[in-house]
């Protein structure tokens, strides 16, 4: 996403909030400094009482999935983003479960990690098309209803 932020550097009203303490955090911070990006803000890990507010503040939720686990998993943060009605920008293989979820619920778009320009264009499209953003947001909220704790109990 830092490369996407770099392409959108002149869009003064677009911010990238990066939450967590993953092993790539220091590299990402270094990249933002090298590129002179003031649009990227880093937040530490957040507890479950705080996190929903941060996620709900976003106009787009980003979910990444590596190639090795693409066929068998969906990152858990996906469900938190659905619950707050975030349109999704997913970086994952087109054949992944995550790509299927986004396609099935029509609540975002899935990109290959090399499609940096397309990701930037998608963000600009959502910024400039509030009707589309609202539709995707509503679809995320509707999708969240299928992924409740109670529904999960039906499969355990």
Give each language-model segment a name.
Residues 1-13:
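Short hydrophobic signal-anchor/transmembrane segments that target glycosyltransferases
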Residues 58:
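An anion/phosphate-binding loop that grips the pyrophosphate of nucleotide cofactors and donors
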